Amino acid sequence: MIDKSAFVHPTAIVEEGASIGANAHIGPFCIVGPHVEIGEGTVLKSHVVVNGHTKIGRDNEIYQFASIGEVNQDLKYAGEPTRVEIGDRNRIRESVTIHRGTVQGGGLTKVGSDNLLMINAHIAHDCTVGNRCILANNATLAGHVSVDDFAIIGGMAAVHQFCIIGAHVMVGGCSGVAQDVPPYVIAQGNHATPFGVNIEGLKRRGFSREAITAIRNAYKLIYRSGKTLDEVKPEIAELAETYPEVKAFTDFFARSTRGLIR
């Protein structure tokens, strides 16, 4: 169904069964598949392909040659009706690719809201990207990667499958991330190693001086105390009782499966 207030360019193809919301704009030479939902006010500039069981929220801007919901590159994929879900107010720039999930990975690739995906960024099958993240030009997420809120992945950086990138992390350009990156940390290099706390990012987001100091103290326990992670976990949990921002570390430890970058 195409809402009567939506615009569809005469050269675009919207297959029967697709849902196009109010005031959406489907530009020239776009292709929208039969199981696609496009939300209110979302704009497909031109030459955009949206395929598969894909749901896109409202007020997104999707630029030319982006491909969303296409068959993933997992060799086990056998055509199952897996999905892509994208939230609201994202800017998805030229030639970005977002692939549908796999049955083995839960069947869903999910992108939240208010993200900026720069030119040629790739989000593979079963990834989860939170809110207000930035993937710079040519940043690549392998399958099953999780990127938490406010994280930034630098240009041409690559993240290994199943890794977790914590909230407020900054991954430097051209880095190769092969293990989990705890929240608030700057990661740089190939293989990526920790380079301190993303202090400038935290200041910009309104973190208090006291909270930043507590986060730095937690970082020092993890990386500079000479103790094992199991040894410092109780100390970090105690610190989190006074500074709730530190609880992001304890929650992250419970999710981590690949070990932390070192």
Swiss-Prot record:
It comes from the Bacteria. This is Acyl-[acyl-carrier-protein]--UDP-N-acetylglucosamine O-acyltransferase. Homotrimer. Involved in the biosynthesis of lipid A, a phosphorylated glycolipid that anchors the lipopolysaccharide to the outer membrane of the cell. It is an enzyme of class 2 (transferase). Coiled coil: none annotated. Its main location: cytoplasm. The gene is lpxA. GO terms for cellular component: cytoplasm; membrane. Keywords: Acyltransferase, Cytoplasm, Lipid A biosynthesis, Lipid biosynthesis, Lipid metabolism, Repeat, Transferase. It comes from Escherichia coli O157:H7. One of its GO terms (molecular function) is acyl-[acyl-carrier-protein]-UDP-N-acetylglucosamine O-acyltransferase activity. GO terms for biological process: lipid A biosynthetic process. Pfam families: Acetyltransf_11, Hexapep. Pathway: Glycolipid biosynthesis; lipid IV(A) biosynthesis; lipid IV(A) from (3R)-3-hydroxytetradecanoyl-[acyl-carrier-protein] and UDP-N-acetyl-alpha-D-glucosamine: step 1/6. Belongs to the transferase hexapeptide repeat family. LpxA subfamily. Gene3D superfamilies: Hexapeptide repeat proteins, Udp N-acetylglucosamine O-acyltransferase, C-terminal domain. It catalyses: a (3R)-hydroxyacyl-[ACP] + UDP-N-acetyl-alpha-D-glucosamine = a UDP-3-O-[(3R)-3-hydroxyacyl]-N-acetyl-alpha-D-glucosamine + holo-[ACP]. Its EC number is 2.3.1.129. It is found in: Cytoplasm.
